[in-house]
Amino acid sequence: MLHIFLSYFYIIFFLIVFPTQLLLLYVIIFHSPKHLKTLKRIFLCNCSCQIFSMITLVLLQARQVSNLNPVELWCYGPLRYLDAIVAYTMYVLCEGTVLMSSILIFITMYVKYEAVRSIHRERSAKFSVIILSLSPLFITMSAEAYLTIEYHLPIEYQEKFSAINSNLGDHTVIGYIALDNIPAQIVFCTICGFFVIFPLIMFCLRRNIILFINSKLDLSSTTMRQQNRALINGLTLQAFLPLFCVCPIFICSFVALITKTEILLEQYFVSVVLLLPTFFEPYITFYTVSHYRKQVRIWLGKENMGSMMLVVSVSRL
């Protein structure tokens, strides 16, 4: 059975990724130079969101049964022993943190774009960009809050879930996904629209950054070229990651939801593909941020503090 295999996968995945996330969190807090003040805050928020979403997904081990009407959410993880409202609330919060993490990746790329092009905007303009970027999160969470209060929090719904789950063994039903009301349609359209538009914007920013870097290539030092190469490679990975991890499973979910076709890989692996960025993102951050990369190499005995000071000096230019 897939859920038995995945129960071991989730544990192994957690044991591998959680220490890496903690290491990244430590490096961000204690080894971020002062000139990375803005990026430090973004990295901290993103790392915290990814840690929370990873722990929640491992505890949930959710399955989205898309061929049923309405779509049922099944929980195979330890949270199945708690009330359905608790597991569903954690599912909604996880949905929000995954969306938040994706938005923060975009904001990170936008900040790098402004840094590369030496664009200095007023604080109000930066605030407007951040609010606009976070608007999908605000819309989704507002609609999800309404759905939770209206369709999951009332006593009669909790009693209904308790009656259903009393006869189940290896899983519990924690909630439903139905598109028969406006808030649910808003959530569906916002999330699907975001994960379609998000990679396109990322590729546009990546292209503009590469064009600008290439135009200044003759004036760059060897060290700066190496840092630019790492930056471009990191931007490429961040742009392609949602395209290959999230978009295919969302397309399968959309097809299954419309046609009511039973696609087991889609049902079980929705949570798995949402976990994948938590594996890749720490390594991308270590690789693209030269100060973090050098710090790790110092710990491994492959660099000395002199090279670290050189990186700090060059990165300020």
UniProtKB/Swiss-Prot annotation:
Main localisation: membrane
Cellular compartments annotated: Membrane
Keyword list, A-Z: Membrane, Transmembrane, Transmembrane helix
Pfam families (alphabetical): 7TM_GPCR_Srd
Gene label: srd-46
Xref: Gene3D superfamilies: Rhodopsin 7-helix transmembrane proteins
A single cellular component GO annotation: membrane
Protein name: Serpentine receptor class delta-46
Domain of life: Eukaryota
Membrane topology: Multi-pass membrane protein
Family, as annotated: Belongs to the nematode receptor-like protein srd family.
Cysteines joined through disulfide linkages: none
Organism per entry: Caenorhabditis elegans
Keyword Transmembrane belongs to the record: yes
Residue intervals passing through the bilayer: 9-29, 42-62, 91-111, 129-149, 185-205, 239-259, 269-289
